[in-house]
């Protein structure tokens, strides 16, 4: 089971009912935060998921509406009692940005580990950038006015132990547990590997987050078969497409086009322009292309369960 909360859905500037952009993913006691705009920790306090277990913060890019909540959040994490290292991932320039944002708070009771990614826009996938237990984070360069990344968070599901397979392979009972945990074991001068006792691969969970970009073809494959695709819809109106092209953003129908091409299960629109006071008025522009589209809102929550297999 994986929990997702859209902490903030505003773009550019906060409004009376929208914090700036941020997405929180929680799985098995671990939390991943993508972007940290103003108001992030306010929403976190309201949903009461806790701060101490935030292990990774991923930045898409370094425009102010995506990073200005970091300083306060790091201080709150410190006050929560965290002492384990915290990892921050982002495009090139991460060290300079974090250094600037923490001038007023230079000391924390935990180490901050920084991972800077090559984020020149291209059609090539970046390799897996981070792994924590069963959760893997991937990144893809997209097309904004500055270097920007899209992120995909994938939860791998453990394969079931297959007793019949273990017996057929004549695996000694006393090493079953270690093989089930993924270890290779040499026993009585013979090598035993996990594949000798484990069943078929099982479908995991995939969440893809994309904001501040024009549509790029590589997103179709990157977001392919996502259980949830959280994508920017800066403007709802079709007539705003020219502005979206100029500002390197998307309109609702373009986000829906990516969702359809990627065959995702569900699309949440987010990162709305402050001028877009009623995004639901333009929802049909997206639903005509991809039916299972929803308007994002601050503190919108979804629980995704593994399929029964």
From Swiss-Prot:
Entry cofactors: Zn(2+)
SMART domains: Lactamase_B
Positions contributing to Zn(2+) 1 binding: 61, 63, 144, 212
Top EC group: hydrolase
Cofactor binding comment, as recorded: Binds 2 Zn(2+) ions.
Enzyme Commission numbers on file: 3.1.26.11
Active-site residues per Swiss-Prot or TrEMBL entry: 65
Coiled-coil residue windows: none
Cross-referenced Pfam families: Lactamase_B
List of residues binding Zn(2+) 2: 65-66, 212, 271
Presence of the UniProt keyword Zinc in the record: yes
Molecular function, one GO term: 3'-tRNA processing endoribonuclease activity
Keyword Hydrolase: yes
Keywords tagged on the record: Endonuclease, Hydrolase, Metal-binding, Nuclease, tRNA processing, Zinc
Gene3D superfamilies reported for this sequence: Ribonuclease Z/Hydroxyacylglutathione hydrolase-like
Reactions mediated catalytically: Endonucleolytic cleavage of RNA, removing extra 3' nucleotides from tRNA precursor, generating 3' termini of tRNAs. A 3'-hydroxy group is left at the tRNA terminus and a 5'-phosphoryl group is left at the trailer molecule
Homology family: Belongs to the RNase Z family.
Assembly, per entry: Homodimer.
Family matches, as PANTHER family: ZINC PHOSPHODIESTERASE ELAC PROTEIN 1
Free-text function comment from the UniProt entry: Zinc phosphodiesterase, which displays some tRNA 3'-processing endonuclease activity. Probably involved in tRNA maturation, by removing a 3'-trailer from precursor tRNA.
Protein's UniProt name: Ribonuclease Z
Organism: Clostridium acetobutylicum (strain ATCC 824 / DSM 792 / JCM 1419 / IAM 19013 / LMG 5710 / NBRC 13948 / NRRL B-527 / VKM B-1787 / 2291 / W)
């Amino acid at each position: 089971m994986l929990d997702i909360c859209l902490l903030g859905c505003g773009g550019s500037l906060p409004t009376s009912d929208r914090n700036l952009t941020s997405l929180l993913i929680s799985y098995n006691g671990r939390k991943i935060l993508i972007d940290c705009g103003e108001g992030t920790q306010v929403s976190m306090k309201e949903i009461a998921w806790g701060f101490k277990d935030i292990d990774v913060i991923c930045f898409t890019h370094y425009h102010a509406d995506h990073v200005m909540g970091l300083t306060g959040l790091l201080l709150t994490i410190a006050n929560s009692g965290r002492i384990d290292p915290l990892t921050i991932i982002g495009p090139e320039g991460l060290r300079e940005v974090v250094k600037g944002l923490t001038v007023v708070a230079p000391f924390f009771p935990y180490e901050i580990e920084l991972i800077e990614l090559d984020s020149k826009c291209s059609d090539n996938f970046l390799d897996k950038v981070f792994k924590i237990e069963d959760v893997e984070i991937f990144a893809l360069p997209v097309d904004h006015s500055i270097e920007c990344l899209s992120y995909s968070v994938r939860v791998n599901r453990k394969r079931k132990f297959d007793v019949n397979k273990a017996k057929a392979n004549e695996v000694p009972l006393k090493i079953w547990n270690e093989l089930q945990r993924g270890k290779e074991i040499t026993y009585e001068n013979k090598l035993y590997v996990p594949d000798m006792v484990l069943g078929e691969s099982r479908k995991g969970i995939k969440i893809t987050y994309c904001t501040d970009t024009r549509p790029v073809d590589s997103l179709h494959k990157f977001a392919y078969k996502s259980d949830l695709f959280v994508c920017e819809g800066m403007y709802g109106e079709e007539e705003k497409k020219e502005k979206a092209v100029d500002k390197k953003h998307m309109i609702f129908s373009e986000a829906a086009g990516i969702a359809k091409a990627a065959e995702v299960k569900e699309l949440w629109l987010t990162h709305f322009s402050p001028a877009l006071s009623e995004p639901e008025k333009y929802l049909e522009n997206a639903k005509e292309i991809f039916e299972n589209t929803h308007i994002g809102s601050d503190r919108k929550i979804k629980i995704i369960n593994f399929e029964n297999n």
